[in-house]
A protein has these predicted regions:
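Short glycine/proline-enriched loop/turn "hinge" motifs that connect secondary-structure elements
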Residues: 115-122
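Cofactor- and metal-binding active-site motifs of prokaryotic enzymes
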Residues: 84, 108, 124
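Beta-strand scaffold of nucleotide-dependent catalytic cores
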Residues: 104-107, 115
Length: 134
């Protein structure tokens, strides 16, 4: 019996020339941001669902229709992060009391949308520079 191994619908691999372009963009982004003393951060792909709901907004399409969330062993609802704002806000709230905090990040985000050309369930998000002092 032949097994069909394929991508999950709405996802894609990045490789070859497309990967080279992607790496170039990421490198330029970090280079420019570092010139302005922004610090990079890597946050978990999983977040508490209520955190995302509060920071993004309960009534937004992201929370009401597009978020991948599930009950984690009957303890709490968690989700695959749909964007970076919630993770950056959580980090800032729990790690900094005062002062200037300039953070940047990039990484995979997940949205349950109807797949179509150019729109994927898994996307790479490059955060805009975050400045909680503004």
């Amino acid at each position: 019996m032949k097994r069909n191994i394929s991508l999950v619908k709405g996802t894609h691999d990045i490789h070859g020339a497309e990967m080279e372009k992607f790496e170039f963009i990421i490198e330029k982004f970090y280079s420019v941001c570092r010139n302005f003393n922004f610090k990079s951060i890597q946050t978990p792909i999983l977040e508490q669902q209520d955190l995302v709901s509060r920071t993004v907004g309960e009534q937004t399409d992201i929370v009401s229709k597009e978020m991948y969330s599930f009950l984690d062993k009957g303890e709490a609802y968690i989700c695959l992060r749909p964007e970076a704002t919630s993770s950056l806000a959580r980090f800032a709230a729990s790690n900094y009391q005062s002062g200037l905090l300039k953070l940047i990040t990039h990484g995979p985000m997940f949205r349950r949308e109807r797949p179509q050309k150019g729109r994927y369930l898994s996307l790479i998000h490059i955060s805009e520079p975050t400045r909680p002092d503004v």
